[in-house]
A protein has these predicted regions:
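A post-motif C-terminal structural segment
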Residues: 1-220
Length: 220
């Protein structure tokens, strides 16, 4: 499936895409390829935009359209393992590029491995990935506070692990306990945080599909 997604990405019309998985963008004849055919989505991308495969190339990205695949496989190391180009750095670079469009832009930033930590019932994994995501959110809020015309929405499509926070006295600096109900997804309601113009539209309880509908209304 990843090889097909790589082809669709190369054929798409978008401005910025940063992530991993360069092995799916090069033909099987190239060392490190994860494809089983001779298709070369990477060449198609390079004909359209600036492309980075290394941290050095990423730092040099300047074009209005840019792509980066910074790992061979389709995921990055854990936040705790360290990686030169963090989610925050990718977010700031994306904002730098997209903000040059005077028609505005839409940017989605995902902290994908928070979910993986939930599946593993690994609190330290969840914590580290949440902190990395929080840094990325901070980058967006820095931009929005200066721009004063950017709506920021932070949410999730589901909760994973059925995590519960147990006893502990915050004022006494006691460690708070926790437990998990499942290694799968739960039906727990997820929070929605918003900041900027029309942020009040996203308060209260709502179906998660309403978020997208409201965003389209604002875009129009």
């Amino acid at each position: 499936m990843q090889d097909v997604i790589a082809e669709q990405i190369a054929e798409g019309s978008w401005d910025v895409l940063f992530g991993a998985g360069w092995g799916y963008f090069v033909p099987q004849s190239v060392e490190g390829s994860l494809r089983t055919d001779d298709k070369n989505p990477l060449d198609m991308l390079k004909s359209k935009m600036q492309v980075a495969l290394t941290p050095e190339e990423f730092n040099a990205l300047r074009d209005r359209r840019a792509a980066a695949m910074l790992e061979r496989t389709n995921y990055f190391p854990k936040a705790s393992e360290g990686f030169e180009i963090t989610l925050e750095i990718m977010t700031r670079k994306a904002l730098d590029i997209l903000s040059n469009n005077n028609k505005g832009f839409f940017l989605m930033v995902e902290g994908s491995q928070i979910d993986w930590g939930g599946h593993a019932n690994d609190m330290e994994y969840i914590r580290d990935e949440m902190l990395a995501f929080d840094d990325a959110v901070g980058a967006v809020l820095d931009f929005a506070e200066e721009d004063k015309n950017t709506l920021v929405i932070v949410t999730a499509d589901h909760e994973t692990g059925g995590m519960a926070v147990l006893s502990g006295d915050f004022e006494e600096h006691e460690l708070v306990g926790y437990d998990f109900a499942t290694k799968g997804h739960s039906a727990v309601m997820v929070p929605v945080f918003s900041f900027g113009p029309s942020a009040k539209l996203f308060g209260g309880m709502q179906d998660n599909t309403d978020i997208g509908k409201k965003m389209f209304q604002l875009w129009d």
